[in-house]
């Protein structure tokens, strides 16, 4: 899967319309673009009627091939506003190989001032759009946009969704034949269900025949303007079953839309927000006196993307999660709660320099690029021992501010000093107990308490481990304020938040003591020397008494494969019995439904990447719970699934 982003190459004609150089075609007809969209995509699919018939708390899903300028999305959103119940939701999924850059997108949408209520929210969030799945949330969660950035035959096969309406809007088949292939139409069929409808401009004969072969009943209908005819259709083919029952979707929860989230750190607060935005009443149980008291409580965390040039599952998740987090941060106060000051990873030795060279070749310049030492120093504002890799969209975040912001939704109730010791399943409800005291109950529970989720029997076998880390808080000086970007080597140092820099962080695999130690403060100061002797001097490190330094220690929680553990939980004993045959033949796929623990989910194991992976994982949990399109490629969601460890034990006999 390609990791390089190619933006649309746009020329503008004398009437202000964008013209694609890649496809030598216009994005929409002059003076008729919106009317064409309304006729072909909204009218032929009877979208207004569909929206009006959406029941409260249900979600209509539109799939599109070719996002382009977003016109179809904006028009569909406007129609949804006009006709849908206020508690219904819209999820729009669109594939785009060559996304417009921000400036081109702003110029294109300025042609439709009547759609400003819909175009402006997108422009505000149109940041960090990189290859893979990129999710946007609008209208307090009522509308979700998932852009699949890349080649359609790389992206759509990874989509896990059930589409109600298709907009086929790639450039004309003669200009863009890759968007009109039997392989693509097979993917449309895979993602459709009886009742799925389709609209498209093209009436090309071989396109119609290929769609019919894929399972769509197609017909020509009157067109608009210079387009005499267009096509519409409906899916009448078979519905494929899931291939791997252990990763199949559990039944969508019925009954009251109430959930418990245990833990109010990044994983818990973002999961609660994702559910609340979907109309759930969420109770968050936190054992401390306030949210973000453990690993999510550091004064500054770094938005650092540890990527792979090989497109691994972790790398794909980081790229998608980074974009989602950056869009969430737009709602916080810049400078106090976060700052997009960039992150500079120093090439501190030959091995690191080689790794960075591969990354610079694999990813686009807007995401990361190599800097020589002089260039790096000019950006950082302090002298450095080497150049490195610069991530211009990175920066630092005050994690407690993000947690607090996520928990402010009116559908969330936070209860502190609630230490859940035991879960009990009673009928269709889960009960949270502290000794002989019932704290709360709900049909859905999400365990988001880092490694402490293992105190609950359904998570007891999850291989989570705790790694102690300590940060050091250094008082800023007049000269240390010259630091303008986060700089990383083996450790990291951030520009000041208020009057303090954050320096860290140690790794201790053995200690269970969370009292900050002088030795680790000294270790962090040594890391600072490796980052910048100049900055250490500006901070007066030589005169600092390590015994008087302030800091903070917490446990990171990580898994053996460094991917988080996110998704529905199964009964471990019943799982082992149901799929015991895998121990003899791993190629077997038993026709046995997974023994889910109905309504029970986990979101844990984010390690030092929680700022990037936890918010999108909250969306992943909510998608599992509500039966919505997953916000990550299916293979990535499976790589994060809690069942992966039980499968490995069965197959490897461990």
Curated annotation (Swiss-Prot):
The keyword Cell membrane does not apply. It catalyses: 5-aminomethyl-2-thiouridine(34) in tRNA + S-adenosyl-L-methionine = 5-methylaminomethyl-2-thiouridine(34) in tRNA + S-adenosyl-L-homocysteine + H(+). NCBIfam families: MnmC_Cterm, PRK01747.1-2, tRNA_MNMC2. Residues 1-236 are annotated as: tRNA (mnm(5)s(2)U34)-methyltransferase. The keyword Flavoprotein applies. InterPro entries: FAD-dep_OxRdtase, FAD/NAD-bd_sf, MnmC-like_methylTransf, SAM-dependent_MTases_sf, tRNA_MAMT_biosynth_bifunc_MnmC, tRNA_MNMC2, tRNA_S-uridine_synth_MnmC_C. It is found in: Cytoplasm. Keywords: Cytoplasm, FAD, Flavoprotein, Methyltransferase, Multifunctional enzyme, Oxidoreductase, S-adenosyl-L-methionine, Transferase, tRNA processing. This is tRNA 5-methylaminomethyl-2-thiouridine biosynthesis bifunctional protein MnmC. Residues 262-654 are annotated as: FAD-dependent cmnm(5)s(2)U34 oxidoreductase. GO terms for biological process: methylation; tRNA wobble uridine modification. In the N-terminal section; belongs to the methyltransferase superfamily. tRNA (mnm(5)s(2)U34)-methyltransferase family. Pfam families: DAO (PF01266), Methyltransf_30 (PF05430). Its cofactor is FAD. It comes from the Bacteria. The gene is mnmC. Its EC number is 2.1.1.61, 1.5.-.-. Catalyzes the last two steps in the biosynthesis of 5-methylaminomethyl-2-thiouridine (mnm(5)s(2)U) at the wobble position (U34) in tRNA. Catalyzes the FAD-dependent demodification of cmnm(5)s(2)U34 to nm(5)s(2)U34, followed by the transfer of a methyl group from S-adenosyl-L-methionine to nm(5)s(2)U34, to form mnm(5)s(2)U34. One of its GO terms (cellular component) is cytoplasm. GO terms for molecular function: flavin adenine dinucleotide binding; oxidoreductase activity, acting on the CH-NH group of donors; tRNA (5-methylaminomethyl-2-thiouridylate)(34)-methyltransferase activity.
